[in-house]
């Protein structure tokens, strides 16, 4: 910067680059990188880009000094190859990791314990979002309480009066499986915003047309589906 005019030009260029970087940094990871390569590798990709930019700038100023840092990306790449092959979060004790995926919405894990129970964990893994067992339907957890929902209708009310069900927040199908066992093969609409969770449910929780033919799944926002469905 040699004068006021060039200072304004440089400042404008910096702000333009900053704005472009903000847009790329906002949309590229969320829409492309994280769903395709995961959070950890996304960090490594952006770290590599920043290193290349910094290295190029330093090389223009002092090539000899820049060459001292060539080893850094090589070491980081080798460490990533050898240390990042395992799961982001290890499974619980006495459990096996069956499925791990980072979608556009969630970090998804499915684990199976030594008694054959399968569990759906999302993101930080503090809560169980769905549970499944080949021979059991009721687990003494939160989902069991939803079976009482029809009895909030005006009495007298009998189980055969339950004609259909809408679930917003389907996860991998614990609630519809329970409803089918209690109230029969009633039509069920299940809404889950994350299509990867629906796919995992079909593969690992029997949430498919063969085992739950009366269940229709929607990979949509719940508010949108409420406005689109004409059932009451």
Positions of predicted regions on the chain:
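C-terminal membrane-cytosol helix-exit motif in multi-pass small-molecule transporters
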Residues: 50-64, 80-87
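Active-site-adjacent beta-strand anchor residues
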Residues: 35, 168-169, 191, 216-219
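Class I S-adenosylmethionine
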Residues: 73-189, 194-207
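Intracellular juxtamembrane helix-capping segments at the cytosolic ends
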Residues: 1-3
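S-adenosyl-L-methionine
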Residues: 198-232
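Membrane-embedded alpha-helical segments of integral membrane proteins
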Residues: 10-60
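Membrane-interfacial entry segments at the cytosolic side of transmembrane helices
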Residues: 62-75
């Amino acid at each position: 910067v040699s004068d006021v005019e060039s200072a304004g030009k440089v400042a404008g260029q910096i702000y333009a680059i900053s704005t472009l970087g903000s847009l790329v940094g906002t949309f590229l990871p969320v829409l492309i990188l994280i769903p395709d390569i995961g959070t950890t590798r996304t960090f490594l990709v952006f770290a590599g880009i920043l290193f290349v930019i910094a290295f190029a700038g330093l090389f223009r100023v002092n090539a000899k000094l820049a060459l001292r840092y060539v080893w850094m990306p090589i070491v980081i790449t080798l460490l990533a190859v050898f240390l990042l092959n395992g799961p982001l979060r290890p499974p619980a004790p006495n459990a096996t990791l069956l499925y791990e995926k980072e979608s556009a919405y969630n970090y998804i894990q499915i684990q199976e314990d030594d008694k054959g129970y399968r569990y759906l964990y999302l993101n930080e893994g503090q809560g169980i979002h769905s549970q499944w067992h080949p021979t059991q339907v009721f687990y003494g957890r939160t989902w069991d309480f939803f079976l009482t929902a029809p009895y909030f209708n005006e009495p007298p009310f009998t189980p055969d009066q339950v004609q259909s069900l809408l679930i917003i927040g389907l996860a991998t199908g614990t609630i519809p499986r329970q409803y089918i066992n209690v109230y029969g093969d009633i039509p069920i609409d299940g809404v889950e915003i994350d299509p990867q969770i629906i796919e995992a449910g079909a593969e690992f929780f029997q949430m498919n047309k063969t085992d739950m033919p009366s269940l229709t799944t929607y990979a949509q926002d719940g508010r949108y589906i409420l406005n689109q469905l004409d059932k009451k």
